[in-house]
């Protein structure tokens, strides 16, 4: 368990035939074109107008201009050997006001062009309906994810997407990381629309309506589209693995509780009909309740689980940790070091991201055991580096730490499959350097470097070239790559 995993050897042959390898992005982070194509404002468009909210004062107004460069990007993706692409559809490009009445045909045309070009290049589309870019009008008029009305509006939006794109898109994700929207968007306020730490109950309400909205979208698909289109609809949850800090019972239970407040918060209602008991015990009336009708409605409304995973932590029980409310109420302390003082893994650029490949194997096995071995896709996995303006192009393209990250984590996925977890695919985050939310452009997750100072030109990094060799089965070169 103490091994970093970066010395792991992994080849395409370690995975089953048909296993999907792809890359992932999201609309707000890459598209740009804020005021083009009939698009309405989303909450991030408005949130970033206050430059103090973003580390470098930036926004996604232009981002990396994927809206105008999608053909260049898809051609590069295909040339590297990727055969699947997880992208997100911008809700206000389809319904500028979010109300679900007047479809913006220019928005539909853009995504039709994107999807058709992907398929032409041999790339399978995996479409996310919601990756945090809520139509601003819905936030203003109904309160966004704090209102039960959002469930109906989301279902209308989902139906429009299924109707317009579902003849070609067979893999749908309703919502990306509802935990982040709930906690950072409506609770702490680091993300749009910007809540505040004192309004603790808001994040649990925002989570509640995201679960119901997910179920409503799946219901629409199953009733109106599945028989003809034959696709599948899943939910993407983010989770860091929680490794007990010691063999003490209280630490073992604390680690389980930490997972309840991540995976369990969203998947328990769908698979079992209600929130984890550990959440109910600690939150009381702050945690909304599902009616019996709701419980019946949401049960088993899922075809696959998408897991976004980047890192792991040691978890110890702590009666009153000095942390934000979301962690205080869990009564857990997230620890980065072993008892010996050695860190759990090498740190990437972000202070929260440690390279811990073995954590992913444990997480996949945990999810498989808890939820009856569902179909799982690793829908995001990657690491960031600082944006270093003083570095040469050759230096920034030589991302050997990221190559090691991917080797270790992919080996962990292969091990989980051998353990019996039904993992069907893996998507690297991210294809392109992009707008990294509250961090702006100060962090780079891409396997393709985007030169922000020179026309947003694209340059594949060493990690992209490693992936290309891996996908094309050049195992001998792969094994020599890090020597």
Curated annotation (Swiss-Prot):
Gene name of this polypeptide: BGLU4
Residues modified by glycosylation: 398
Record's catalysed reaction(s): Hydrolysis of terminal, non-reducing beta-D-glucosyl residues with release of beta-D-glucose
Pfam families: Glyco_hydro_1 (PF00232)
Sequence positions that bind a beta-D-glucoside: 29, 131, 176-177, 310, 380, 429, 436-437, 445
Keywords: Glycoprotein, Glycosidase, Hydrolase
Domain of life: Eukaryota
EC number: 3.2.1.21
GO MF, one example: beta-D-fucosidase activity
Catalytic residue positions: 177, 380
Protein name as catalogued: Beta-glucosidase 4
Disulfide-bonded cysteines: none
Record-stated family: Belongs to the glycosyl hydrolase 1 family.
Signal sequence coordinates: none
One GO biological process term: induced systemic resistance, ethylene mediated signaling pathway
């Amino acid at each position: 368990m103490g091994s970093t995993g970066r010395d792991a050897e992994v080849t395409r042959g370690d995975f089953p035939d048909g296993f999907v390898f792809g890359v992932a992005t999201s609309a707000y982070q890459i598209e740009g074109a804020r005021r083009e194509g009939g698009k309405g404002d989303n909450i991030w468009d408005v949130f970033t107008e206050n430059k103090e909210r973003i580390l470098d004062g930036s926004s996604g107004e232009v981002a990396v201009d994927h809206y105008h460069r999608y053909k260049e990007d898809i051609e590069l993706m295909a040339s590297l050997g990727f055969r699947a692409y997880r992208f997100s559809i911008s809700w206000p490009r389809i319904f500028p006001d979010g109300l679900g009445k007047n479809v913006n045909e220019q928005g539909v045309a853009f995504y039709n062009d994107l999807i058709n070009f992907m398929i032409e290049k041999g790339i399978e589309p995996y479409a996310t309906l919601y990756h945090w870019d809520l139509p601003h009008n819905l936030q203003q008029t109904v309160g966004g994810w704090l209102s039960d009305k959002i469930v109906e509006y989301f279902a209308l939006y989902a139906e429009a997407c299924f109707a317009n794109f579902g003849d070609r898109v067979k893999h749908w994700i309703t919502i990306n990381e509802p935990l982040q929207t709930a906690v950072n968007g409506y609770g702490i306020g680091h993300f749009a629309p910007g809540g505040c730490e004192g309004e603790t109950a808001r994040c649990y309400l925002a989570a509640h309506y995201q679960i119901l909205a997910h179920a409503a979208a799946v219901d629409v698909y199953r009733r109106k589209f599945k028989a003809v289109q034959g696709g599948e609809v899943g939910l993407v949850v983010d989770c860091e693995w929680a490794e007990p800090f010691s063999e003490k019972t209280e630490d073992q239970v604390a680690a389980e509780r930490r997972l309840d407040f991540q995976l369990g918060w969203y998947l328990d209602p769908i698979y079992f009909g209600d929130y984890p008991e550990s959440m109910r015990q600690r939150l009381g009336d702050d945690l909304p309740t599902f009616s019996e009708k709701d419980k019946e409605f949401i049960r088993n409304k899922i075809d696959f689980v998408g897991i976004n995973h980047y890192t792991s932590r040691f978890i110890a029980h702590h009666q009153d940790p000095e942390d934000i409310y979301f962690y205080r109420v869990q009564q857990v302390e997230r620890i980065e070091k072993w008892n010996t003082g050695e860190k759990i893994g090498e740190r990437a650029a972000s202070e929260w991201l440690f390279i811990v490949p073995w954590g992913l194997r444990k997480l996949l096995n945990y999810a498989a055991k808890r939820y009856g071995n569902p179909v799982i896709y690793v829908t995001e996995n990657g690491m960031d580096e600082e944006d270093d303006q003083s570095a040469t192009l050759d230096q920034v393209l030589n991302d050997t730490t990221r190559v090691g990250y991917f080797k270790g984590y992919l080996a962990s996925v292969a091990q989980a499959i051998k353990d019996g977890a039904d993992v069907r695919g893996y998507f690297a985050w991210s294809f392109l350097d992009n707008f990294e939310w509250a961090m702006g452009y100060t962090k780079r997750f891409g396997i393709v470097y985007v030169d922000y100072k020179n026309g947003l030109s694209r340059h594949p990094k060493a990690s992209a070239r490693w992936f290309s060799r891996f996908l094309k089965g050049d195992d001998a070169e792969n094994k020599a790559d890090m020597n």
